[in-house]
Amino acid sequence: MKMKRTVSSNSEAYSYNESPHSPLRFHSPLSDAGDLPESRYVSPEGSPFKIENPKSIVAGNKLTQFSPLPSPIPPPPPQIPPPRRQRNARVPMNSSLDKSPSSMVVQNSWVREDGQQNTTRKAGAPMNGEESATTAVNRARRDDLVSVTALGFRITEVILCVISFSIMAADKTQGWSGDSYDRYKEYRYCLAVNVIAFVYSAFEACDAACYMAKESYMMNCGFHDLFVFSMDQLLAYLLMSASSCAATRVDDWVSNWGKDEFTQMATASIAVSFLAFGAFAVSALISSYRLFTHASS
C-alpha cells in the first residue's frame, strides 16, 4: 500500500508540474499557451542608455507582474484645505490652483496687512451719530454767539443814533448871529435818518432779546430774515448819504464864515452818525449770514 501511495503522489506532482496551467510552465517552451504576445510599448531598437544592473529591473518587473499578492498602492498625499478667502482679499483673475506655497503666503500676508490698515483707518473715523451730534452742538454755539453779537450791535446803534439826532436837534444859537439846524435841508435830512434808524434799531434790539429768551421772533414770519437784511442795507446807505450831505454843508459854512458853536455841534452830530453807519454795516453782514445760512439749511 505504501508503494502505491508514493507512486500516486509522485504522479500527481508530475502531472501538476507538466500541466499547462502551472505557473512554472508559463514561460517554458513546453507551455501550451506559447509565447506571450509582445507588448506594443516595447521599442524595436535597443535602448541607447547602458543599464548597469538589469537584474534589478527584471526582478522588479517580475515582482510587480507575477506577485500573487496585490501591489501596495501608496497612500494619497494629504489634502491641505485652501486658506479661507478674506473679505478684502484681492485675487488676480489669472491665478491658478497650482501656485507655490510661498507665493500664497505672500498673497495672504499682503491681504492681512491691507485689512489691518483698513481696520485702523475705520476705527479712528467717527460714527454718523457722533458726527451729527457734534455738528449740532457746534451750530448751536455758533448761533448763540451770532445772536449775542447782533444784540450788542443793535444796542450800539440805538445809543449812537439817539446821540446823533439829539445833538443835531439841540443845534441852535441865539442872538443877532443865531442860527438853527431847521434852516438847512442837509441837517434836517441827517436828523430824520437818525430818528428812523433809532426806531428801527430799538425794535430790532427788542426782537433779538426776545429770540434769545424764547427762541422766537416778535415778528415771526417767513420773510423775517429777508426783511432785516433789506432794512439794514437801506439804513446803512441812508446814514452814509445823510452824514455826507451834512458834512458838505458844514465844510461850506466853515470855508465862508469860519468855525463857531453852531458848526461844532453839527460836526459832532455828523461824526456820531458816521459811527452809527459803521454799526449798521456790521448788522447788515450778520443779517446776510443768517439769511443765507437758514436758506441753505
From Swiss-Prot:
InterPro entries: CASP_dom. It is a multi-pass membrane protein. Residues 171-189, 247-265 are extracellular. This is CASP-like protein 4A2. Residues 93-121 have a biased composition (Polar residues). Residues 1-149, 211-225, 287-297 are cytoplasmic. Belongs to the Casparian strip membrane proteins (CASP) family. The chain crosses the membrane at residues 150-170, 190-210, 226-246, 266-286. One of its GO terms (cellular component) is plasma membrane. Keywords: Cell membrane, Membrane, Transmembrane, Transmembrane helix. Residues 1-136 are annotated as: Disordered. It is found in: Cell membrane. Residues 8-19 have a biased composition (Low complexity). It comes from the Eukaryota. Residues 69-83 have a biased composition (Pro residues). PANTHER family: CASP-LIKE PROTEIN 4A2 (PTHR33573:SF61), CASP-LIKE PROTEIN 4A4 (PTHR33573). Homodimer and heterodimers. Its main location: membrane.
